[in-house]
A protein has these predicted regions:
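Extracytosolic ligand-binding ectodomains
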Residues: 1-152
């Protein structure tokens, strides 16, 4: 598209998620984005998540939606466990306020005041591996980022 030759840097968020990355082709090489999840995130939790996803759904690609569903389900299990399966909204909310765990996306927590997620944001750059496949290489982490759209 010529933007890079004109000195215009592309800044984005999830535009280079792995589910779309190969279809972008070589024009994507060098693009830098910041987001809370990339399938290329290196961690034991992400490796286990990707392996289980592949086992259950061989054609599925790990992406922000699948990891968000995974974490939402984890939160629900915590809430159900705290209530013993009984209808107790106060106990359910109390169980998750301030909770933290190791997600496939990295460490996350639920802000006790806003009940919104606090998570890392990874700055990554699209590169090509030895087989010519595009991937996001994380090179900087902004840890424990709140939802800046929420007012306390």
């Amino acid at each position: 598209n010529g933007l890079d030759q004109a000195g215009i840097a592309f800044v984005g968020t999830s535009e280079t998620q792995e589910v779309d990355l190969q279809s972008l082709g070589d024009a994507a090489v060098g693009l830098e984005t910041g987001y809370f999840y990339s399938a290329a995130h290196e961690s034991a939790a992400n490796d286990a998540f990707k392996a289980k996803l592949k086992e259950l759904y061989p054609n599925a690609e790990p992406n922000p939606a699948t990891v968000s569903a995974f974490d939402g389900t984890h939160a629900l299990y915590q809430m159900i466990g705290a209530t013993g399966g009984k209808k107790d909204p106060d106990a359910a909310i109390a169980a998750i306020k301030g909770a933290s765990w190791e997600s496939p996306r990295g460490p996350i927590s639920i802000d006790a005041g806003t009940r919104d997620i606090v998570q890392n944001v990874y700055i990554r750059k699209v590169e090509k591996d030895a087989d010519g496949r595009l991937f996001n290489r994380e090179y900087k982490t902004y840890e424990t980022q709140p939802d800046y759209g929420v007012q306390k």
